[in-house]
C-alpha cells in the first residue's frame, strides 16, 4: 500500500513524498499505541476542535513513556526501500496528541506536553539513525490554541527535534483543520489569523521549515514577510474539496507569494494530507500542482 501511495506521488512529480500514513489507523493514536500510560480499552467522551466534533478518546492513566522498539524507523525503512525519492516521515506533535486524547492523570498541561515531546524525540532520533533526511511534526492544534502554543507548545516542538543534526530537515506542519468528508463548507476551521500571532515564535524556533495552508484559507500574503529565517511550505491544493484546481490559478497565487518571500525559501505542497480524496482525483491535483510549480 505504501508503494502504491509513493508511486502516485512520484508519478505526479512530487520530489519529497510521504508514505501516506497507510499503516496507521489514526495519525495520532498510532503513536500513542506504542507508549506506556495510554488506555485504549476504557475510552473517555470528549468534545474536540472548538466543538467541531465529539468522540470517544483513549485515556492517559499513567506517566507517558516509550515502551519497546521504535516503530518509526521500521516504517520509514520499509517505505524508503520502495521509493526512488527521499521519503519524508511525519509524526503527531505533543499539543495535538493532547487534544485528541483524554488526560486522566497529569492535570498539568506543560508537563504532559514535555513528556509527549520526549517520546516523539525518541522516534525522531531513531529516524535520523535510519537515514531519514526529512522529518515533520504535525501541530494543527497551534492554530486553535495559540496561547498554549506560545506558553509551552513551541518549547515542546523544539524538544521533539533535540539532538537532530543540521543534515536533517526539521519541519513543522500547522493547518487549520478539516472535516471528515469532502465539500463540507460548514466545518468550523481554526482562524488563519493565528498564523500571524504565531509567526514571530515560529520564525525564531529551532527547526527549519513551517508548513501552512493557503488554498483553503487564502492568507494575507504579508504573513510571508514575517518569516525571515524559515522556509515556508505553502499549501496550494484544497485537500477537502472535490474541485480540481487549474494550473493557472496555482501559478497566479505562487507568483503573488513570491512578492513577499525569497524564491529559495518557498516550497509548494498541498494544504494537508490527501486522505479525503479519491485516488485519481488526488493524483490529478498533485499533477496540476507540480506542473504549476515547474512553470514558476
Regions found by a protein language model. Name each.
Residues 1-296:
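Domain-level signal for soluble alpha/beta catalytic cores
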Amino acid at each position: 500500500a505504501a508503494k502504491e501511495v509513493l508511486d502516485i506521488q512520484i508519478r505526479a512529480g512530487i520530489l519529497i513524498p510521504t508514505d501516506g500514513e497507510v499503516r496507521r489507523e489514526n495519525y495520532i493514536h498510532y503513536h500513542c499505541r506504542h507508549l506506556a500510560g495510554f488506555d485504549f480499552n476504557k475510552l473517555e467522551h470528549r468534545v474536540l476542535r472548538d466543538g467541531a466534533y465529539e468522540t470517544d478518546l483513549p485515556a492517559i492513566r499513567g506517566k507517558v513513556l516509550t515502551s519497546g522498539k521504535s516503530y518509526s524507523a521500521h516504517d520509514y525503512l520499509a517505505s524508503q526501500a520502495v521509493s526512488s525519492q527521499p521519503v519524508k516521515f511525519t509524526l503527531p506533535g505533543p499539543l495535538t496528541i493532547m487534544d485528541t486524547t483524554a488526560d486522566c492523570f497529569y492535570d498539568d498541561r506543560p508537563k504532559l506536553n514535555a513528556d509527549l515531546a520526549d517520546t516523539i524525540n525518541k522516534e525522531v532520533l531513531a529516524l535520523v539513525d535510519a537515514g531519514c533526511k526529512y522529518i515533520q511534526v504535525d501541530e494543527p492544534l497551534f492554530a486553535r490554541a495559540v496561547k498554549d502554543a506560545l506558553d509551552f507548545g513551541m518549547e515542546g516542538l523544539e524538544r521533539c527535534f533535540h539532538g537532530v543534526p543540521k543534515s536533517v530537515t526539521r519541519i513543522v506542519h500547522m493547518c487549520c483543520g478539516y472535516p471528515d468528508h469532502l465539500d463540507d463548507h460548514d466545518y468550523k476551521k481554526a482562524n488563519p489569523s493565528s498564523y500571524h500571532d504565531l509567526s514571530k515564535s515560529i520564525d525564531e524556533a529551532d527547526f527549519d521549515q513551517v508548513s501552512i495552508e493557503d488554498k483553503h484559507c487564502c492568507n494575507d500574503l504579508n504573513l510571508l514577510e514575517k518569516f525571515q529565517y524559515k522556509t515556508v511550505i505553502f499549501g496550494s491544493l484544497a485537500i477537502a474539496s472535490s474541485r480540481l484546481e487549474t494550473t493557472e490559478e496555482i501559478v497566479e497565487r505562487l507568483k503573488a507569494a513570491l512578492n513577499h518571500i525569497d524564491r529559495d525559501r518557498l516550497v509548494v505542497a498541498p494544504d494537508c494530507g490527501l486522505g479525503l480524496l479519491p485516488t485519481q482525483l488526488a493524483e490529478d491535483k498533485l499533477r496540476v500542482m507540480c506542473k504549476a510549480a515547474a512553470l514558476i
